[in-house]
Amino acid sequence: MRAVFGGQHGEREMQSEIAVKLSENVPRYTSYPTAPHFHSGVDAAIYRGWLEALESGDEISLYLHIPYCDKLCWFCACHTKQTHQYEPVAAYLRSLNAEIVTIAGLVSGKAHVRAIHFGGGSPTMLRPNDMVALGAALRDSFDLLPDATVSIEIGTNDMDKARLDALAQIGVTRASLGVQDFDPQVQKAINREQSFLQTKAVVDGVRSRGVESVNLDLLYGLPNQTRETICSTVAQALTLEPDRMALFGYAHVPWFKKHQTMIDEAWLPSPTERFAQSQLAARAIVAKGYEAIGLDHFAKPDDALAIAARAGVLHRNFQGYTEDRCPTLIGLGPSSIGRFRQGYVQNMASTAGYGRMVADGGLAAVRGVALSDDDRVRGWIIERLMCDFAFSAVDLVERFGKAGEKLLHRSRSIALHDPARALEFDGDSFVVRAESRPFVRTIAAKFDTYFKGGTARHSVAV
């Protein structure tokens, strides 16, 4: 997205034409192979072997999933459920602690934790004492590096002084707040009411307690959303001076998330309008000095994400773009996905089923994929396209040898026969043309041997 901010009328027309050609339903490529292609052949026994194969000195990241919210937002595509009672949450925490003990027993003394991320659902719906206890359990069970980062997704409507204090106690270094859109009509249409003043109070609250980095998530393509509302939201969000911002396109997938049927599709903007919203919002963010990162992130120039992007070491995982270089990510909680050198593994999605599996020292893995040599090469190409909009032919061959040479020929064929001329080869590198960068997911899909257009349902490319 970073190279499409010119204001020329002709350029906008060209981008709109490309949008019509390339706005297909394609994966988001937060992994490769993507989650729909995970299978039951990777189970708890294989997962245990991958954990035991970690070596002394390995650095790992942890992701903890809290699959509950006290109010369900209709736009949400996350694995979560609404509850007005706390007992299911308390019971779930007992299961989560059991999994923590089991995993720690397999990796402690070998692996060091570089990063922890709390996601959901809404992690901040936990009672403050439970939040502190969970943080303590992680520190007691795993070997955390002194400079380990701790990030959390915040539900603004959950927050009070006690919860803000709890974040400080567990050592949160980065807080991410979902804003979506500040317009009341948009908020009503997505069942999420959250004022600018509420958001500002939470941002001020976490900063006053030592949180080093604040991220704000915005959405375009929402029901009742217009170019005016998204621009107004961006302007208000920028006054909070976040260190990072994400600008995601709303993924309308009611066949996957039934509660999205609460959104009247007649209220959704057209593909052309979605594209216009995304570009206007992105231009406004960059105009304030933020650097565009990959497809949909922005960061201040001195932020670790921007530094990683400039150095060519940006990565992509299930939370989006990251500077985290750990080759191993351990997912804790139902539906959580782990990444290992050997492949990907995913826990049971059912909270009740997950609880039964982790009882008495069990693991909850029920699906995943072991990586082939071809998967590794294609995954590297796709990640570099998603992160850098380019990849080096020399790097490809040096890293992967004959397997890289095979994909080099495929890459040249894609560049040569692409009617949209979205990918070009300059003799050294394959580069996504500037005006095609918003549609890089469509380009990445050309390297995906699992993806068959029309056979799997994904969100639109823009």
Cite the ranges covered by each PLM segment.
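Flexible, acidic/Gly-rich N-terminal and inter-domain linker regions that tether
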Residues: 1-61
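C-terminal scaffold of the Radical SAM
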Residues: 52-59, 83-106, 112-402, 461
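Local cysteine-cluster metal-coordination motifs and their immediate loop/turn environment
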Residues: 64-80
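Short amphipathic alpha-helical interaction segments
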Residues: 403-416
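A short, conserved structural fragment
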Residues: 418-428
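Minor-groove-contacting beta-hairpin "wing" of winged helix-turn-helix DNA-binding domains
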Residues: 429-433
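Short, amphipathic alpha-helical interaction segments positioned at domain boundaries
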Residues: 437-462
